[in-house]
């Protein structure tokens, strides 16, 4: 088995640059979904129900993408086709989701539309996100992996910061941060539009700049035979892999499991909590108002 060559900083950057756009999309989703559904007419105290389907899809999509991409060999690479398709779907859904209240639908229909688009958005973001992590494992040697993941972490946090700031930035530019009842404000809509544009441009950049190894090159650098690898991959599934996972995997997984309790509460209820405690918005009265508007629309 040959040693994987050292990559220049530029090449390590190119491997993960698309992650910047993916994280902008993820930040826009996590920061604004509660606001969008509350605007559409959802009870602010029951917003967590809208978050049930997206994580379920993530449980399925992430291992499926990993398993399928392990067995995929195309002229475009093995990971890049998945991240490009995921990003393309995410861009489409990001243009639709904030407009759920602008299509003239009844409140119930708008919320169902929003729920379905949220499910596809979370699924497509997961599909676009995971291949970037796999590219580092495929193409970076052990000596440079710490640097590669540090670059990825920097781009991840930078993208999150940009995504969180976008609505404030566009409001400061004079784009309306308020809208008629049941309609998402333009500052949020344009945040999703610009985020979608940055996402696809970042992914196109990585797609154009990164050339994945051929099956022969992969086998040469990773000590595997591609035909044997494909044959072995077909003998098991991700459930089998879970049963044989090392103890460290389960320890880290347990910590992550409890961390995500806090993340979901934070993303779902922070907006309403800040509105009630910092700005004095009466969320109970707001709930009754939206319920009355829902009855009128129905």
List where the protein language model places each region.
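Short helix-loop-helix connector
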Residues: 41-42, 69, 73, 139-141, ...
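C-terminal ends and interior cores of transmembrane alpha-helices
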Residues: 84-106
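Intracellular loop-helix junctions on the cytosolic face of multi-pass helical membrane proteins
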Residues: 1-10, 101, 105-116, 127-128, ...
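Helix-loop boundary and gating motifs at the non-cytosolic
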Residues: 2-55, 251, 264-280
